[in-house]
Amino acid sequence: MKPDKTENTEHGIEPVSKTKRKAEADALQAIGVTLTELPRDKLNKLDLPEALLDAVNEAKRITSNGALRRQMQYIGRLMRDIDTDPIVEQLQRWEGSHTEENARFHRLEQWRNRLIEDESALSEFISEFPNTEAQQVRNLIRNARREHAAGKPPKSSRELFKLLRSITEAPPPGTELSAD
């Protein structure tokens, strides 16, 4: 018979409930699922033990649901023996940067749509981003409106988006680094 796992509490050493052990195993399996969804280059950056890396790569190849479920349980079992905190922290950093990137992308799309639809939006954009070349933006807005009215592909709209991205990513004027 296997000895029960125990946990130190303020009342001494108590056995860990089966429910808690199952919840911990499920959490490790969820991390394993996340690992299987990562591209290989990110997996290699995580510095995983070789057995775990092999198991994750094997899970990526498996197509059978039953076999994949067993492989995920195996990955969860391997993860019980390692410290998962650094892995979870790195995954959260990657997820945070991805979320920030999506939010920035949506803000740029909103600016582009407002500029195309609303005449007064350009002055707001210029006041927020003073390093904007207004004439270039006006030309792209005008062309995007024409293309939309004619039912043509949104070439100027894409160019406007690229220009807005370069403007918003550029440092504000007066904050340029000096090369000493």
From Swiss-Prot:
Coiled coil: none annotated. GO terms for biological process: assembly of large subunit precursor of preribosome. It holds the Pfam family DarP. It comes from the Bacteria. The keyword Protein biosynthesis does not apply. It is found in: Cytoplasm. InterPro entries: DarP, DarP_sf. Residues 1-21 are annotated as: Disordered. Keywords: Cytoplasm, Ribosome biogenesis, RNA-binding, rRNA-binding. Residues 1-13 have a biased composition (Basic and acidic residues). Member of a network of 50S ribosomal subunit biogenesis factors which assembles along the 30S-50S interface, preventing incorrect 23S rRNA structures from forming. Promotes peptidyl transferase center (PTC) maturation. Belongs to the DarP family. This is Dual-action ribosomal maturation protein DarP.
